[in-house]
């Protein structure tokens, strides 16, 4: 226990930068948030201005302190969580970025990834980095900057440039250019990192022609990396002491630190992580193998899977079908009927991800009879989110041999009690919704607080990680399996819909 009273989590996301002030009981005291510019130079290209990322993040740090009326000497530490994979390259001597940040969503390096596949590197990349070959990850973005920005490759070869994901950039700026580090969770998303040896991979650097000198040092997610002071030079020095990529930070914020523990974040899509302990499991179902934290913030492993369309399907009901006026209405309409009347909605608007991996699948509504109405369609759309979650979690359990203990949940759609209850029913496990909804920030705060002695250990945190509500599954196994069988039948009929007839 220290005489400090607060931790600040910096939550640097894809559309906004946030600072979250937490007290010793892990309660949120104050939040500051600033949105920043999304830059779309061409179709499929997405960029951010690194200086704007820093400006919005540093201003929220100042603002959260000012709004709460606390002083810098009451702050024990700062933790960082960030949008993953987004890539920044800057000059070591001036701190000036040589190009905008290339965002995780950006598809500009598809030709580079196509060549990696054509050259036969898929299996090596899969086995070494745990990732699939895709423009999503940082490695090909770094190569693009070095190949396309005038003078960048020459400067990199001379040791004059630095690369970092957003966490690295923020630590470098917070410490006035003294510290160039990342953590294992962010390193594992670069496609340059060997997740087994926990080192930068020489062969990947050679394949992508990236000089080792630009890479940050890789450290644990919970340790003191350097110090900063709020509001410019002078003043109290505050340790920067925790780093984790956003999904791994959420896993830690839920205190899922042991094998078999999982979380699902319900946003536009869903991000699911299943902790697999010290086993790096190569998925047979197209899931990613990634690094997560153990109780001490040291690297262990997780399987990661995503659902493309979750909350977005409710927006579709609102914006395109116009059968709900507000996303919050979906629960009300779903409960106006006692079941879905045999209706299934497969929201494969952009294809289907794990475990189907079919880009040609398309959305469909099945099982319509004369008695089907709008309420049945709303109910079936909500149920589709839970069914897709079961699809991914079954793939995870199949790959890992781990039986899910319970599912911790966060994200906007978790406020929908009907959806959460149906999720428990269809998975046959308890679904736990936490009191503190800022789970990603909480993970970064926990990591920083443990590194600085603000909290003693995870046992102390367990008392603070309160569950607001537990949704327990219906005991009717026959009904559960009948419903899921119907879902699988509906999905089967949606597959390959957009594929041109080969005849």
From Swiss-Prot:
InterPro entries named among the record's database cross-references: ATPase_NBD (IPR043129), Carb_kinase_FGGY (IPR000577), Carb_kinase_FGGY_CS (IPR018483), FGGY_C (IPR018485), FGGY_N (IPR018484), Glycerol_kin (IPR005999)
Catalytic reaction list: glycerol + ATP = sn-glycerol 3-phosphate + ADP + H(+)
Record keywords: ATP-binding, Glycerol metabolism, Kinase, Nucleotide-binding, Transferase
Binding site for sn-glycerol 3-phosphate: 14, 84-85, 136, 246
Enzyme class (EC, first level): transferase
Binding site for ATP: 14-16, 268, 311, 315, 412
One term under GO cellular component: cytosol
Binding-site list for ADP: 14, 18, 268, 311, 412, 416
This enzyme's EC code(s): 2.7.1.30
Gene Ontology biological-process annotations: glycerol catabolic process; glycerol metabolic process; glycerol-3-phosphate metabolic process
Function of the molecule: Key enzyme in the regulation of glycerol uptake and metabolism. Catalyzes the phosphorylation of glycerol to yield sn-glycerol 3-phosphate.
PANTHER family: GLYCEROL KINASE, SUGAR KINASE
Record protein name field: Glycerol kinase
Source organism of the structure: Haemophilus influenzae (strain PittGG)
Taxonomy of the source species: Bacteria, Pseudomonadati, Pseudomonadota, Gammaproteobacteria, Pasteurellales
Gene that encodes it: glpK
């Amino acid at each position: 226990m220290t005489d400090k009273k607060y931790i600040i989590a910096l939550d640097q996301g894809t559309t906004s930068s946030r600072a979250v002030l937490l007290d010793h009981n892990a309660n949120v005291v104050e939040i500051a948030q600033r949105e920043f510019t999304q830059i779309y130079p061409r179709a499929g290209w997405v960029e951010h201005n690194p200086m704007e990322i820093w400006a919005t993040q540093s201003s929220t740090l100042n603002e959260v302190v000012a709004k709460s009326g606390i002083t810098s000497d009451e702050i024990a530490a700062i933790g960082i969580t960030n949008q993953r994979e987004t890539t920044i390259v800057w000059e070591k001597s001036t701190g000036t970025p040589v190009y905008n940040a290339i965002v995780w969503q950006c598809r500009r390096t598809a030709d580079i990834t196509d060549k990696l596949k054509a050259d036969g590197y898929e299996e090596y990349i899969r086995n070494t980095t745990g990732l699939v070959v895709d423009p999503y990850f940082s490695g090909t973005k770094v190569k693009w900057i070095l190949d396309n920005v005038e003078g960048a490759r020459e400067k990199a070869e001379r040791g004059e440039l630095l690369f970092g994901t957003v966490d690295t950039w923020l630590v470098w700026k917070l410490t006035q250019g003294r510290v160039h580090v990342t953590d294992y969770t962010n390193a594992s998303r670069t496609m340059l990192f060997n997740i087994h040896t926990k080192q930068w991979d020489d062969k990947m650097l050679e394949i992508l022609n990236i000089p080792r000198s630009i890479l940050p040092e890789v450290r644990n997610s919970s340790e003191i990396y350097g110090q900063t002071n709020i509001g410019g030079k002078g003043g109290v020095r505050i340790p920067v002491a925790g780093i984790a990529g956003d999904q791994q930070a959420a896993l830690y914020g839920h205190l899922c630190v042991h094998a078999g523990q999982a979380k699902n974040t319900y946003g536009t899509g869903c991000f699911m992580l299943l902790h697999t302990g010290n086993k790096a499991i190569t998925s047979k179902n197209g899931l990613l193998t990634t690094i997560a934290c153990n109780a001490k913030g040291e690297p262990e492993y997780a399987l990661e899977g995503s659902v493309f369309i979750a909350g977005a399907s409710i927006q579709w009901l609102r914006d395109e079908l116009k059968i709900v006026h507000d996303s919050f209405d979906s629960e009300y309409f779903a409960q106006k009927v006692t079941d879905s009347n045999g209706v299934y909605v497969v929201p494969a608007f952009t294809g289907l991800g794990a475990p189907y991996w079919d880009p040609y699948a398309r959305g469909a509504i099945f099982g319509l009879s004369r008695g089907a109405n709008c309420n049945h369609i709303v109910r079936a759309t909500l149920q589709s989110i839970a069914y897709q979650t079961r699809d991914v979690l079954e793939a995870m359990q199949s790959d890992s041999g781990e039986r899910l203990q319970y599912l911790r949940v966060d994200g906007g759609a978790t406020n929908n009690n009907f959806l959460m209850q149906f999720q428990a029913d269809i998975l046959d496990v308890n679904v736990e919704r936490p009191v503190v909804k800022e789970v990603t920030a909480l993970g970064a705060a926990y990591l920083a607080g443990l590194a600085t002695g603000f909290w003693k250990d995870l046992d102390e945190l367990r008392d603070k990680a309160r569950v607001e509500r537990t949704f327990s599954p219906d005991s009717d196994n026959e009904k559960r399996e009948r419903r899921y069988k119907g879902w699988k039948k509906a999905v089967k009929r949606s597959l390959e819909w957009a594929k041109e007839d080969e005849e």
